[in-house]
Amino acid sequence: MTKPLLLSLIFFIIPAALAVDVDQSKNEVKAQRYFGSISISNANVKQCVWFAMKEYNKGSEDKYLFLLDKTLHATLQITDRMEYHIDVQISRSNCRKPLNNTENCIPQKNPKLEKKLSCSFLVGALPWNGEFDLLSKECKDV
């Protein structure tokens, strides 16, 4: 039972290790696999969206939390980590910051407070280590 496990680990680790190329003269990491589409239902994409939303709400000066309406598109690039470029639509909720865990947040119904945004997040991840970094975010009113 250990041989098949060992072989599968070898076949996974070696290509992953070869996927990254560091240019020592420029001290930069080159992408070995450029952005390609990935399913929005992928577990890593969902983790990255959750992380990006948490970071967005933490950094936002809005008095209300924003909720994910839908994930529109996701792409993946492999460098020294996995980089997910994710396009989402989010909306202001009825929950004020800081969140009380007993609240059930729903999108804002008050027309004066309603707000929808289209956002692009770039999340660097080593999901197997639980490491996530929000590399960039850009949001525009819808």
Swiss-Prot record:
Localization annotation: Secreted
InterPro entries, per the entry: Cystatin_dom, Cystatin_sf, Sperm_Mat_Cystatin
Pfam families assigned to the protein according to its UniProt record, in alphabetical order: Cystatin
Domain of life: Eukaryota
Keyword Ribosomal protein among record annotations: no
Signal peptide segment: 1-19
Glycosylated residues (UniProt): 100
Residue span of motif Secondary area of contact: 77-81
Residue pairs linked by disulfide bridges in the UniProt entry: 95-105, 119-139
Keywords of the record: Disulfide bond, Glycoprotein, Protease inhibitor, Secreted, Signal, Thiol protease inhibitor
Annotated Gene Ontology cellular component terms: cell surface; cytoplasm; extracellular region
Record-level Gene Ontology MF annotations: cysteine-type endopeptidase inhibitor activity
SUPFAM superfamilies the record matches: Cystatin/monellin
The family this protein is said to belong to: Belongs to the cystatin family.
PANTHER family tied to this protein: CYSTATIN-8 (PTHR47010:SF1), CYSTATIN-8-RELATED (PTHR47010)
Role of this protein: Performs a specialized role during sperm development and maturation.
Name of this chain's protein: Cystatin-8
Organism: Rattus norvegicus
